[in-house]
């Protein structure tokens, strides 16, 4: 009985370690620096994780922290087809957090388009959010202006508290303090 319990605990611990490093990176040019455990990937970089596929032209991966710094023509697509595009981003493989810096475009699985800045894509909590202003465009041509937002990925719902302005396809304007 003790042996079975020991084997179970050992198996559980080893399984956790195996799944923590499931990051696959490909590129045309690869430079490895073993002394600091970093790798630099250039030209047509492709990264596959358990939850998304990321492409860019440059990536620097730190094996110790499992953080990837991405630059130039970044596109991240999750399994539900939510797409984020930017020119600078960081992906933390341990926390499953993808965050952009600067101008960012988000296209949701429902084909809504959002232009904003500094967007966080949290795979563990299934949330995309930003504390910066953003503009959401729907399929009918309506525009929603947010001071900040939170998008619940599994429910396809946007939430925001603060000044929210909606301009519909007929150019009517509505203002709200919160939206859900």
For the regions a protein language model found, what residue spans apply to each?
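Positively charged n-region of N-terminal signal peptides that target proteins for export
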Residues: 1-7
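Bacterial N-terminal signal peptides
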Residues: 7-17
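N-terminal amphipathic/hydrophobic interface segments
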Residues: 19-180
């Amino acid at each position: 009985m003790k042996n079975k319990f020991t084997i179970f605990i050992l198996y559980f611990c080893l399984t956790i370690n195996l799944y923590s490093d499931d990051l696959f990176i490909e590129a045309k040019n690869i430079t490895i620096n073993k002394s600091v455990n970093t790798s630099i990937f250039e030209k047509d970089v492709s990264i596959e994780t358990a939850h998304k596929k990321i492409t860019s032209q440059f990536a620097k991966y730190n094996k110790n922290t499992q953080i990837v710094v991405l630059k130039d023509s970044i596109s991240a697509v999750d399994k539900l087809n939510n797409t984020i595009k930017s020119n600078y981003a960081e992906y933390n493989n341990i926390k499953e957090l993808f965050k952009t810096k600067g101008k960012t475009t988000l296209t949701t699985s429902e084909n809504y388009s959002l232009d904003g800045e500094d967007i966080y894509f949290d795979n563990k909590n299934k949330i995309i959010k930003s504390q910066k202003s953003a503009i959401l465009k729907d399929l009918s041509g309506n525009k929603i202006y947010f001071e900040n937002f939170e998008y619940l990925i599994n429910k396809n719902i946007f939430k925001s508290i603060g000044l929210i302005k909606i301009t519909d396809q007929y150019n009517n304007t509505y203002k709200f303090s919160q939206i859900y």
